[in-house]
């Protein structure tokens, strides 16, 4: 079977459904695919094909995730849906499924539930920038006042976690009604699609961001100087650009005097490409794996941060025993391990394999970081956890 050519004509946006178990996330995902296929063309997907989510492994963590795609006249969406609560936690923390926006599904019959809060908190911690609410099962509630009450509660809950609760779109609908072809509920799915188009801004493309390349290797070339290699994460590196070497040691500035790819000289390297960058006047021992090459001033080195962490279960090859405060593993950022100590939240004495937990990490050497940076927790090269930088402290 030949792969269909991917059309690059429309902006591409990543979204996903979040919310409490059994509130209708997967039904809504199926309804969006089905209704939009009917209205705008595209491929319909039924509930069963989405619910039967394939197992994926991201950094050694097993996650069940379904990926579907759909189109509106203006955009192409990639949408992720997870069957279980644990899958959401893992997905959001590892960044396996990056979201430019989330669709929070809340059943009108239940209102806000524990996982509603947890997913909003996780969304805030891992940096999901925009949330749209779909109040589901509204066909099962006759009382208009009850619907208003649920909407108000959800808006308040979102505001509590610094989302603009008063202003974000809330759509009252019925995913099942829409799946069954009932016109009034199909219209609500179209309304949701329009909200996605207007409320979630077009994400900035990696190539348009400030230049950053994690350094994987360092070579010195006789008569030419020092070359660092790596895959450009974002932005563009042009010959003649001033760059900063950030992390582990003092930040130093230098100039890139050459860019090469597959032994050919180029004028520039772009996001996604593996390149070698020749650095002017830099000695081989001044640069090491684990540092980054970046546009000066665009990223700073830090040692202390608050993070959201998922600890691998024993079945995933993680620890067999809990850990306590004073635990000192390695934290693997981009290309290297750095030892660090942890502080657990008040009232948390120990962390069990399979848990997710908020912790403050203090590294022994600074790493170039932004909020939203992912890392792995390792013991002797074996991954035992995954995390994301939620807030930089120092």
From Swiss-Prot:
GO biological process, one term: translational elongation
Sequence segments annotated as region (G4): 136-139
Record region (G3): 81-84
Top-level taxonomic group: Bacteria
Catalyzed reactions: GTP + H2O = GDP + phosphate + H(+)
Gene3D superfamilies: P-loop containing nucleotide triphosphate hydrolases, Translation factors
Pfam families given in the database record: GTP_EFTU, GTP_EFTU_D2, GTP_EFTU_D3
Localization annotation: Cytoplasm
Keyword entries, A-Z: Cytoplasm, Elongation factor, GTP-binding, Hydrolase, Magnesium, Metal-binding, Nucleotide-binding, Protein biosynthesis
Region (G1): 19-26
Residues where GTP binds: 19-26, 81-85, 136-139
GO molecular function: GTP binding; GTPase activity; guanosine tetraphosphate binding; translation elongation factor activity
Stretches the record annotates as G5: 174-176
EC number: 3.6.5.3
The tr-type G domain, residue ranges: 10-204
Function (record text): GTP hydrolase that promotes the GTP-dependent binding of aminoacyl-tRNA to the A-site of ribosomes during protein biosynthesis.
Family listed: Belongs to the TRAFAC class translation factor GTPase superfamily. Classic translation factor GTPase family. EF-Tu/EF-1A subfamily.
Protein name, as recorded: Elongation factor Tu-A
